[in-house]
Amino acid sequence: MKLGIVGLPNVGKSTLFNSLTKAGAESANYPFCTIDPNVGIVSVPDERIDRLGELYHSKKIVPAVIEFVDIAGLVKGASKGEGLGNQFLANIREVDAIVHVVRCFEDENIVHVDGSIDPARDIETINLELIFSDIEILERRISKIAKQARMDKTLAKELKLAEAVKAHLEDGHMAKTYELGEDEDDQAWFKMYNLLTAKPVI
């Protein structure tokens, strides 16, 4: 499993990454300390695997691992390329789930990118940028298949789904709250879009 650690600049993403992975990623009191993603792999202890290894006299026991990715900070306007926006969003698309770090503490020595501490605002900023990015993905797909959909029933069906999900996002909702139903084609297309707001969030 691959988890992406995301949040605004300077909220402690790299500090959390270092705590989880025992890595030595740079962590400093200025925005965009992290530019290229830091990657760390952590083994997951499991007594059941150890016990099975003993029972079957396994020569080698390979535990499950979690890959953590410390991703550059996001700012308002990232979906339009502000800050390291495009790079940030591309890095998030590669992960299985998002670990969202939100600053809830006051410290005048640590700069906040928006000048004040407001966790609810910060969460909304991140969520909106992810939503805007997903809308852009769907707009590109809709534009690509709209003409062909007039003569292709399968594409017409996909177009209907893409437009419905886009409308859901435009209402301010995350893709994961869209009621997809059990249609296998819809499920396959939805997965293909790889929408950021469809990913699990911790």
PLM-predicted stretches and their roles:
Residues M1-V111, E139:
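Conserved G1/Walker A P-loop phosphate-binding module
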Residues K59, G85-I202:
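Conserved C-terminal guanine-recognition region of P-loop GTPase G domains, centered on the G4
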